[in-house]
Amino acid sequence: MASNNTASIAQARKLVEQLKMEANIDRIKVSKAAADLMAYCEAHAKEDPLLTPVPASENPFREKKFFCAIL
């Protein structure tokens, strides 16, 4: 039973240390974080291949148009 108390105390100390670390984290409002994320996305939109597709001539994954005919 003494080892159970020791383990419980060690676990509680670990939890307190974790909570102290989390309390010291600088936080920002969600609205500010969302605005910053949107600004970043808009600033880098031209570099995003999902928004501005890669030209077919430069796309290494384009479908090859080979036709196979068995005679």
Swiss-Prot record:
Cellular component terms per the entry's GO annotation: extracellular exosome; heterotrimeric G-protein complex; membrane; plasma membrane; synapse
Main location: membrane
Xref: InterPro entries: G-protein_gamma-like_dom, GGL_sf, Gprotein-gamma
Lipid-binding residues (covalent, S-geranylgeranyl cysteine): C68
Keywords assigned by UniProt, alphabetized: Acetylation, Cell membrane, Host-virus interaction, Lipoprotein, Membrane, Methylation, Prenylation, Transducer
Transit peptide recorded as keyword: no
Entry-annotated residues carrying Cysteine methyl ester: C68
Tissue-level expression: Expressed in fetal tissues, including testis, adrenal gland, brain, white blood cells and brain.
UniProt membrane topology term: Lipid-anchor
Any single GO BP term: cellular response to prostaglandin E stimulus
CDD domains given in the database record: GGL
Pro-piece positions: 69-71
GO molecular function, one term: G-protein beta-subunit binding
Subcellular location: Cell membrane
Similarity comment text for this entry: Belongs to the G protein gamma family.
PANTHER family: GUANINE NUCLEOTIDE-BINDING PROTEIN GAMMA SUBUNIT
Function, as annotated: Guanine nucleotide-binding proteins (G proteins) are involved as a modulator or transducer in various transmembrane signaling systems. The beta and gamma chains are required for the GTPase activity, for replacement of GDP by GTP, and for G protein-effector interaction.
Entry protein name: Guanine nucleotide-binding protein G(I)/G(S)/G(O) subunit gamma-2
Species of origin: Homo sapiens
